[in-house]
Amino acid sequence: MTDKVHLGHRARKRFGQNFLFDDMIIGKIVSAIDPKPEDNLVEIGPGLGAITEPVAELSGHLTVVELDKDLAQRLIEHPFLGPKLTVNQGDAMTFDFASLVRDDKKLKVFGNLPYNISTPLLFHLFEFADNIEHMHFMLQKEVVKRMVAGPGSKTFGRLSVMTQYYCNAMPVIEVPPECFKPAPKVDSAVIRLIPKKPEQRTAKSVKILNNVCLEAFNQRRKTLRNSLSNLLTADELTSIGIDVTLRAERLSLQQFIDIANWIYDNKQ
């Protein structure tokens, strides 16, 4: 049996499949999720059920979103898991997570996210921040570092700003490659994301905030005078209290929000 086959299933490269099998790491992840019978739990990409099974044992029921038809069917037919799952066979990138909110009970979302689509999938999930209580995701360690990076760090970028705009983010566990089959070529880590309350998210337009980040970080080595020249003049930036000689990585989250709100108020 090759390293790509685990529990009779061949990992599919196009789905970014790497299956977690280390019991100690699985136990730590489940402890971090802390599933309870009253929780509205949602797993993205349950795969072969390594985390699904212990979570279902503690919660009694959960909803899963699985793109791979074979794996979805395998979960439906699973003698232990089948009755405890609501299986949605489909793409999490287009899934309406708000549809899973029941009796005003927010979602607790978790999963081992495919590394090849993790960033766009996170941005999709951020759109449902008001429907989510917390999230726990296995990601490439470098992605987790970028998500929690602060101003002045070389890894501080658009993902850092947008993650921290929507959520309080904390690394939980580091996971080496040998805990998976097949072993990925990168280190992994689990991150905890707790969405902020709506009143804490003060951007008047998230679309503009995201666009400011795209422009600012597109050419990281440029100063803000140049990198944001398509959006604001140097004088306009100065009027907001922004030092135009800085690079984007030196700005705080609040300064990005201030720029976005100024554009919303003055450039519409």
Swiss-Prot record:
It catalyses: adenosine(1518)/adenosine(1519) in 16S rRNA + 4 S-adenosyl-L-methionine = N(6)-dimethyladenosine(1518)/N(6)-dimethyladenosine(1519) in 16S rRNA + 4 S-adenosyl-L-homocysteine + 4 H(+). It is found in: Cytoplasm. One of its GO terms (cellular component) is cytosol. The keyword S-adenosyl-L-methionine applies. CDD domains: AdoMet_MTases. SUPFAM superfamilies: S-adenosyl-L-methionine-dependent methyltransferases. It comes from the Bacteria. Keywords: Cytoplasm, Methyltransferase, RNA-binding, rRNA processing, S-adenosyl-L-methionine, Transferase. InterPro entries: KsgA/Erm (IPR001737), rRNA_Ade_diMease-like_C (IPR023165), rRNA_Ade_Mease_Trfase_CS (IPR020596), rRNA_Ade_methylase_Trfase_N (IPR020598), rRNA_adenine_dimethylase (IPR011530), SAM-dependent_MTases_sf (IPR029063). Gene3D superfamilies: Ribosomal RNA adenine dimethylase-like, domain 2, Vaccinia Virus protein VP39. S-adenosyl-L-methionine binds at residues 18, 20, 45, 66, 91, 112. Its EC number is 2.1.1.182. The keyword Transmembrane helix does not apply. SMART domains: rADc. GO terms for molecular function: 16S rRNA (adenine(1518)-N(6)/adenine(1519)-N(6))-dimethyltransferase activity; RNA binding. Specifically dimethylates two adjacent adenosines (A1518 and A1519) in the loop of a conserved hairpin near the 3'-end of 16S rRNA in the 30S particle. May play a critical role in biogenesis of 30S subunits. NCBIfam families: ksgA. Belongs to the class I-like SAM-binding methyltransferase superfamily. rRNA adenine N(6)-methyltransferase family. RsmA subfamily. This is Ribosomal RNA small subunit methyltransferase A. It comes from Pseudoalteromonas translucida (strain TAC 125).
